[in-house]
Every structure is written in C-alpha cells, then in structure tokens.
C-alpha cells in the first residue's frame, strides 16, 4: 500500500469540509500513514475524544480515518477556555517522524493486543 503524501492531504483538506475541528497546528505525516495503513487493513482503534466538534485527543487517527473511510467512535473529551480551533487548511503536516522506533514498536504491540492478532501481522502491514 502506498503512503499518503503531504500534498494529497493538503489537497484533501482544501477540497473537503472536515466535520471536526483541529486544535493542533501541526501533525505528523508518518504517524498518519501508519494509522491509515492499519485502518485500511481493518485494524480497530479506540475512539477519539471530542467536545463541541473540537478534537481533544485523536487528531492523527481522525485524519487517517477520513482518508481510509474508516468509522471511529467519538467519546466525550474536555477542552479548556484556552483551547482554540485551528482551520485544517492551516495545519502543517510534517514529514519528520515524531515517533522513535521504540514508540512505534510499543504502539504496534498495543494495536496487536487490542485487535487480538499477532504483532507480526501489524508489522507486515506497515512494510
């Protein structure tokens, strides 16, 4: 499966109305790609936290889910008075990977456990 490019995400958010609002100014493209590949393969994820259409937790999962046409549960979250909405067209999609190899492995293990599948299947999906 091909990776989603920065240009493809920017074109998508520019051409589409995104239901939920971001509260982040930057997101990590490699993280989105790993989640996207897993979602396309049917790997389940926990819900994202939302309050008043603002994403409190789960920005990478949300964008990946839209691109993969994957339904994600929405659970109540909490925002503060300082939390601001960020237009998706203003979000920077960074190509540098924010996760260390150790964190990627830990997340893969969590996903394998959550889905009750061998970690080798998760690792294979990401190749």
Report the location of each language-model feature:
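Short alpha-helix boundary/capping and kink motifs at helix termini
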Residues: 2-56, 60-67, 71-73, 78
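Basic- and aromatic-enriched surface patches that contact anionic nucleotides/nucleic acids
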Residues: 47-127
């Amino acid at each position: 499966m091909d990776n989603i490019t920065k240009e493809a995400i920017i074109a998508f958010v520019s051409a589409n109305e995104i239901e939920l609002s971001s509260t982040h100014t930057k997101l990590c493209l490699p993280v989105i790609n790993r989640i996207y590949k897993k979602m396309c393969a049917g790997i389940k994820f926990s819900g994202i936290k939302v309050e008043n259409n603002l994403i409190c937790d789960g920005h990478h999962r949300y964008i990946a889910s839209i691109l993969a046409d994957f339904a994600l549960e929405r659970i109540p979250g909490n925002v503060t008075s300082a939390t601001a909405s960020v237009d998706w067209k203003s979000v920077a999609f960074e190509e540098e990977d924010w996760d260390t190899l150790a964190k990627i492995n830990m997340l893969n293990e969590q996903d394998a456990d959550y889905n009750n599948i061998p970690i080798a299947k998760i690792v294979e999906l990401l190749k």
